[in-house]
C-alpha cells in the first residue's frame, strides 16, 4: 500500500501506534520517505475482506511536527467495503482511570474460548483518553474484549496480560442524523444555517473494565 500526501511527512512511533485490521500476526513494514508512506503487509490477505490501516497520530508534518490526527486508510479485497464502526472507552477496573494503548478487538465467534484460541476479527488501540473506534466492521453479532497483548498473538494466552470485556453482545448499526452548519458573514453575523445529513455509527458508548487475573 502506497500513500501519497501533499506535503513532506514523517512517522513517529509507527510500530506502537499504527494498527492494521484484521490483525497481522507478522508485523507490517511501514516506512515514510518524502511525501509518501509505504506499507508492506507481510501476511496473506483474506478474500472478500475490508482492511483498515489506522495511523492514529503517527503521521506528522516534517516541518512543525503537527500530527495528522486519526488518519485511517481503508481498502477491500472484495467488491464492497464494510463501513460499520464500534466505539467506546476502556477503564481500569480498580480506579476507573482510562487506559492508553490497550488493544480492543471483536470476535464473530461468540464462544468464550475464542478469546484464548483465535485472533481477533477486527482490532483498534485506545488513545490517551482510553477511547477506541473499531472501523470496517461487517454487520453481525460480536463479542468485544480488551487485551494488553504482550506477545502480539492477538489472543489471551498469558495470565500476566491485562484483559477487559463487556458482557453484552455488540451489534453494529447506523442511523441518519442531522448536523447544523452555519455560514458566517463575519465574526459576529451569520448568513444561513444549513442542515446536513450524515450517518452515525453505533454503539459509540461501550465501556470495558480492565483487570489482571491473579
Regions found by a protein language model. Give the residues of each.
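Acidic, low-complexity Ser/Thr/Gly/Pro-rich repeat segments typical of extracellular/periplasmic
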Residues: 1-129, 133-136, 141-147, 159-174, ...
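Acidic carboxylate motifs that coordinate Ca2+ or other divalent cations, activating on Asp/Glu
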Residues: 153
Amino acid at each position: 500500500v502506497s500513500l501519497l500526501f501533499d506535503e513532506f511527512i514523517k512517522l513517529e512511533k509507527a510500530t506502537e501506534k499504527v494498527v492494521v485490521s484484521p490483525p497481522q500476526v507478522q508485523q507490517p513494514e511501514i516506512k515514510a520517505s518524502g511525501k509518501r508512506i509505504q506499507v508492506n503487509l507481510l501476511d496473506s490477505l483474506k478474500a472478500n475482506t475490508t482492511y483498515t490501516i489506522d495511523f492514529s497520530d503517527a503521521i506528522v508534518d516534517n516541518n512543525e511536527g503537527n500530527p495528522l490526527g486519526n488518519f485511517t486508510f481503508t481498502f477491500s479485497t472484495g467488491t464492497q467495503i464494510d463501513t460499520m464502526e464500534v466505539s467506546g472507552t476502556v477503564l481500569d477496573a480498580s480506579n476507573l482511570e482510562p487506559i492508553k494503548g490497550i488493544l480492543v478487538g471483536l470476535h464473530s465467534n461468540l464462544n468464550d474460548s475464542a478469546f484464548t484460541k483465535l485472533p481477533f476479527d477486527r482490532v483498534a488501540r485506545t488513545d490517551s483518553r482510553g477511547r477506541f473506534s473499531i472501523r470496517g466492521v461487517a454487520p453481525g453479532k460480536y463479542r468485544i474484549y480488551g487485551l494488553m497483548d504482550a506477545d502480539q498473538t492477538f489472543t489471551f494466552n498469558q495470565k500476566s496480560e491485562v484483559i477487559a470485556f463487556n458482557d453484552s453482545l455488540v451489534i453494529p448499526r447506523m442511523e441518519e442524523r442531522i448536523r447544523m452548519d452555519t455560514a458566517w458573514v463575519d465574526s459576529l453575523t451569520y448568513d444561513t444555517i444549513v442542515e446536513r445529513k450524515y450517518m452515525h455509527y453505533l454503539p459509540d458508548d461501550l465501556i470495558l473494565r480492565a483487570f489482571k487475573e491473579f
